Amino acid sequence: MILKYSLLGNLLLLWMNIVNSVVLVGLYYGFLTTFSIGPSYLLLLRTRVMKEGSEKEVSATTAFIMGQFIIFISTYYPPLHLALSRPHTLTVLVLPYLLLHFLFFWNNHKSLFDHRSTHGNFIPNLSIQYVFLNNLIFQLFNHFILPSSTLTRLVDISMFRCNNKILFVISSFFGWLIGHILLMKSIGLVLSWPWEKMRSNALFRSNKYLVSKWRNSVSQIFSILLFITCVCYLGRMPSPIITKKLKESSKGEEKKKTEKERDVEMETISKTKKIEQEEERSVEEDLSISLEGRWNPYKIYETEEIRLNGKEKDEFGFKEKEKNELLWVEKSLLSLLFDYQRWNRPLRYIENDRFSNAVRNEMSQYFFNTCASDGKQIISFTYPPSLSTFFEMIQKKMYFRTAEKLPAEDLSNEWVSTTEKQRDNLRNEFINRIEAIDKGSLILDVVEKRARLCNDEEEQECLPKFYDPLLNGPYRGTIKKGYLYSIRNDSITSIQGSTKISWINKIHGILSKDYREFEHEIYKLDVKSSSAGIDDSSVSIGEFTEEAEEAEESRTRFKQFAFWGEEKEINSENQAEFLFDMVRADPNDQKISNQSIKIEEMKKKVPRWLYKLTADFDFEEEEEEEEEEDDEEEPTDDHGIRSRKAKRVVIYTDTDTDEDTDTNIINTTDSDQAKNSDQAKNSDQAKKSDQAKNSDQAEEHEMALIRYSQQSDFRRDIIKGSMRAQRRKTVTWEMFQTDVHSPLFLDRIDKTPLFSFDISRMMNLIFRNWMEEKSLKLKRKTSDYAGEGAKEEEHEEEKREYKRKEDKRQEDERIAIAEAWDTIPFAQAVRSSLLVTHSILRKYIVLPSLIIVKNIGRMLLFQFPEWYEDFKEWSREMHVKCTYNGVQLSETEFPKDWLTDGIQIKILFPFSLKPWRRSKLRSHHRDLRKKQKNFCFLTVWGVETELPFGSPRKNPFFFEPIHKTLEKKIRKVKKKGFFILKILKDNIKGFLEIFKEKIRWVIKIVLFIKSKVIFFFRLTRVFDPIPNNKDSKISNRIIHESPIRIGSRDWANDSLTERKINDLADKTIKIRDQVEKIMKDKKKKITESQKYIWQISKKRSARLIPKWNSFMKSFIERIYMGILLCITNIYKINVKFFLDSTLDSTKKILNRYTYNDETKEKDTNETNPNIIPFISTIKSLSTYTTTISSNSHSPIYCDLSSLSQAYVFYKLLQTQVSNKYKSESIFQYYRTYPFIKDRIKDYFHNYFHTRGISDSESKHKKLRNSGMNEWKNWLRNHYQYNLSRAKWSGLAPLKWRNKVNQHRTIKNNDLQKLDSYEEKDQLIHSEIKDFYKLGLLKSPSHTKKMKKHYRYDLLSYKYINYEYVKDSNIYGSPLQVNRHGEILSLSNYNTHKYKSFYVITINDCLEDKYIIDTDQNLDRKYFELRIIYFYPRNDIETRTSTDIGTFTKKNKTTKTGTNKKDLYIRIHQEIQTKQKEFFFDWMGMNEQMLDRTISNLDPWFLPEFVPLYDRYRTNPWIIPIKLLLFDFNGNKKSDLYIDPKVKSNQKERSNPKAESNQKEYLELENRNRDEKERQHQGNLISDTRNQKKDVGANSTGSDIKKRRKKKKFKSKKEAELDLLLKKYFLFQLRWGDSFNQRMTNNIKVYCLLLRLMDPSEIAISSIERGEMGLDVMLIHKDLSLPELIKRGIFIIEPVRLSTKWDGISIMYQTIAISLTHKVQHQTNRGYQAKKHIDENYFNGSIACHGGVRVNGDNNNYDLLVPENILSPNHRREFRIISRFNYRNRNVVNKNPVFFNRAKTNAQGFEKFVDRDKHFDTDTNNSLKWKVFLWPTHRLEDLACMNRYWFDTNNGSRFSMSRIHMYQRFGIR
């Protein structure tokens, strides 16, 4: 079995080696390159298809393989790669060959190569060589089928990673060869099929002509394909001949300027004869070039290169001019064929501020290179190019170094050994420092100090932090790059020269050895001017470039200094720089003699474009200067950049200056003729100048507008003549399309239905009207039940919305039509001609003809004609010519270039033909605005429209008035006829009624007579209705015979009454039957419903039976919780209220008589007069608390997949100190035993272990791999992530930010120590002075930074020791620890109510909200809550201090004062008042509580929420907004302003002693604050002596400056206005939309009125129409801003305050995580904390209950980091070195011991560690230092942690090379 496993392992190892080998990777990539087919495949296939012979096939295949091999070699050989990859080089080489190939060789190769002469001297056959050359050259072409650039990059990267590059190239070539053979074999099988068919065909075998014809056709097909391929390939490049020539920069001007400067320099050189001429010329030329380049940065450096390696130039460079003239012919020839300096790609020109010519985009910021990391060469993907070029230059100069390279293993071993030595040295130093502490040395002598560069050691005066080279980080600054023009010259006396002061690097000696001697004189640099522009970032002191000044006395006096940082200078010369080794000053003549090093500047010429491009509508100042200097040169309109499609439209031309221009022309011509002698030339020049001036004056007096095209211009800002990109993924399918779109996203963009595949959208388009009508009907039906007012409002809103959409749709249609006319060629000319034609026809032909016809018709109808009225109205109609946008010009003047730019014709007072003058036409729409618009525009079809390109409007019909009059007359006639018919109808109706009554009377008489006759004859008949009813019951009754004889009657002889009786009987029977039927149905339904209800109740009861028990339980619990607890709490509240009231009354009585007694109760408290409705807050917080408490002991299910680890890590770093782990974490941190005393440890251990709060025993745990599971376990132990699965899944991103982040752990300010600390003030102040003396505590900000470093350290330890994370915590600096504190017994405490472990205080849940830009000026317009200060209540009470979860101590000596547990808002020294009423009464904190009754109605039914309530009372950050706007005390006369100067003069009814104590306390606080502010307003140079003097009672003050005083308001309105402005501090003014439209309309009307002789009528009509606004005309130039705002011209838009971030700050915050300290959230920054620091803080690492008086918060620290003895740099270095195991990187199960001496000699630790029974069981956890594994985390986590571990304060030093992204190939 063992043999089998070993064989399997060997095979697996062999397979892994083969897979990772260079050969296999090369074969793989080579095989992939087979599918990138180029044009040479066509030639290769042609030889195989044509069957021209085996020799040609072999030559073609050989050339093909050789070309591919050259391509592979080019990847290894850079010159060949550049030659083949450069498109210009390849184009120049290939174009002549292609020209000869297609024009000459392709048609004549048979006659040239196949000609065989019978003579002896015959021409050899060159067809084989021709095929070889074709296949070889075409193989070098770029691929056009599957041109995978990604594949090429992968090949380059793979070769870059390989050690054996030649082996990789060869293997990739063989891989390609294998793929090529397989491809050719497969193609050969396909191509052999047509030849087999031809051979089997008898026709082809017999007819050779068909075979030759087929061969020629195939040859032509291949030639066409090859030609198309070459054209497509060359189409990607610019045309070499047909190209747009751009205007180059004016070289002539530069040459003239350089010549003038050199002439001036020649004069200065001739005057100075102290130095040799040749050296002086070289220096002057160098300086002139640098002066030319620095002083005028807009020039292009075309000067010659200066050679400094022993070769001297000719005198003043005249030979270079001749060389330039000779080279001009070559350059012109090259630029004629192909201009390599022009823009070949569709690049957009971005003009630079310093250089007018743009820099070529050929270099990137980062590129690949190898660098050393951990002793090995690995790849870096962000290697800076500047470092690489510098290293190459150094290697070239370092010729004395050996070229041999050590193996990689030796380098790694050497690095490991040196690192281990360094680690041992640091360990020894660290242990020696700890032993020194144990021996009793002062901590100040042991701690490693930071080195500073001092100016005076005795005075202890240091350099400013900006200029201290020994400091790094945020203290350093950056000198801005710029030009300094202020140089101090008055202080220099008898100076003949000047030199440059600069720092010399040691490396200059390696680069150059050219030493020369010069005599120079002292020149001092103005330090103030150089330090004027310094930013807060890392400094980079660059070179001081000097430049000459033209002067007679001084030879080389510098004119300016340019500071260049780490930026490459853009210059085409290798300037020389003289750096002086040493300077020796002579006080007599101030001359120096030194040696200078002449060094070539190490720089690279950055490629820049030769052309200075201008846009079409840019008017450059350089052209104007050229015209002024040389009048003969006419300005050229050769613009190189395409601007937005626009046209210049002249709207007004002023012709009043013609006379002035004529007189000026005459004067100029006379003066020119008088000055010059040659009359002919002068006259010509005068004419030219006159024409130019006339044209200039004409242009100056033209008022023009720029009309931009509405459609998108995809060519905007693209350089003319540059090649467009082949947009394979962009499609335009509409005439008017705003943007180009890709077909890939066709389903996501708005498109026409033709290209739409969305069926639902098409259905919506088809049935849109039907659906809208249906929805409107539904809305109306549902709105019927609402009120009438709501209906009308909804209807009006629908109408407005519909009108808005319709207007927008019509506007889009008009724009589309306008752009269509403007896009189609020659469309504007056609349209303009049609408009003019229609205008003439309408004005002079159509309308007069209609007038004539109308009047003739009136005369034929015998009516008076209206000739005068009609022609008068016709004469009012005006056809005004307008621009394409509608700007009115005049009736006779056409716009400039109106045939090409377009025209509009506006008809004012349009004529409408009427049947008669008295008739008033009414349009269909009763809109008053439309009545006022008595104008229209003319369309192409000759109809009228209201807007240009709008829909035609409906003109009133001529016969409409006639039709209306006829309708009125017909209506009148009908009305009269209806009246007559009504009268006749009424009369006829009355007659008929009388006639009917008469007939009834006659019938009655006849019936009466008939009845009498029947009765007379006694003929009767008995009526029996029962047999006639079928449904009735038949009764068998015996009918007795009547003694009376009954006669029979017939139905016909029956009377009317009998019939009625019969009918009534039938109806009653039917009704009775129906009632019976309904009763039966009802009974049946009732029985069925009863059965159904019984079934339902039976089912539900069966369901409810199992739930009955739980229901009863929950019901009983509700009753208990809701009723019983309420009763008990009410009883409790009443009892407490009674007790408190009695205690308060007794205390007041005692205070009246014992206010002079010094032994009073220390703890004081206030009552709350205004009760805050806190129930809602309690409910919300209780739900959150119960959720956490219920989940505290349940399994946690968290899904951290969507949460970035960097985000979590950043938030955890922001977690501040939480004291709820205060006591539990101390005794569980066993690794802190060496630094914790035994009695402290035993006390906490026994105390908590007896109560079972946590387990105190630890076990030996094996170090597991720090992976994702451990990371999640670490996160789960933080309660803010301890949520249930339902809660976790329900958290939205916004909720996560608003809730979880706000509920993160912060400092608990409620835990307070009450010991007095006054006894140790003197000792502490002396200690603080010592700390200031050493520079450890420079400022409070320095202390905060120290605390921040401790949090960084402890966070790292916390994660490394994640198995103990439940007990650990992140605390602050141990410098705040009090070693004199004692652990008291339980009997010393008043109360010891223990806080439940799951209860979270308000400090853990609510954090001060972060307000942006808290350091802004208070006079800015924004409202800040921190500037409002309050008084404490004057009625101060004393009580016994009780707290939940804290230990309080009752002191013997107490004094009266406010309890610091209740952090009331502090009193500012400048805010005092004499008023009682305040506008802002935040929870009664401003109220004078003298007349109030004492009450304490805190909600005690939930005791654990009392800290929440107290925190809510005292924390102004969580106050509702309503409390800012209402005065709950009923104060009506309130003012926002509180006068800080007026002191309180009221006589309070409070305790006078307490008030006096308060005043003394406030004065002390104010004095201390003034002292500490004076202390930290320091100058640039920090003086420790002044610091000693300024240190007062405060140990750590703040460097925050005093806030400015508020302005005093005159009235309440002004105060309210200021309050409004404070909310919005930024304003932006914008034009109102309505005003903008009105101004545009006014301008259009002005253009017309200026051209009219009598504009009154047009002006009045324009005002009536609403086109011209009088309010806009009355705008003056000197109107103030309030007036403009009042008129509605400007609108104020407030903008919220936001933070402006730059790239550096974003990078710093991303990589360098900065903690959000609580100092940023302090309520009153004027009140500063008092924090004291012990001397020997290592012996008392636990903050005991000593009297540390702080700003309401004390920190207890459970872990002390001993590394802080070292400096930060050594600390990080020691931590990194001690954590990594260099010999074996598999460190999962290996725990390197921190101290090597602990393994051999345990007594080394006994000196400073107290041994006990628990030490042996936990030694490993105390002494071992575990390894942090980097590769198990994401990149963002590495970036976050990398800032801390590797001391990268800024992001520039963070390199991705530390991440091993690829494994290097080994040499097999």
From Swiss-Prot:
Top-level lineage group: Eukaryota
Membrane topology: Multi-pass membrane protein
Self-association and partners: Part of the Tic complex.
Chain segments annotated as transmembrane: 11-31, 64-84, 87-107, 126-146, 166-186, 221-241
Coiled coil: none
Cellular compartments annotated: Plastid, Chloroplast inner membrane
Compositional bias of kind Acidic residues: 617-636
Classification via PANTHER family: PROTEIN TIC 214 (PTHR33163:SF40), PROTEIN TIC 214-RELATED (PTHR33163)
Gene coding for it: TIC214
Stated name of the protein: Protein TIC 214
Polar residues composition bias: residue spans: 674-683
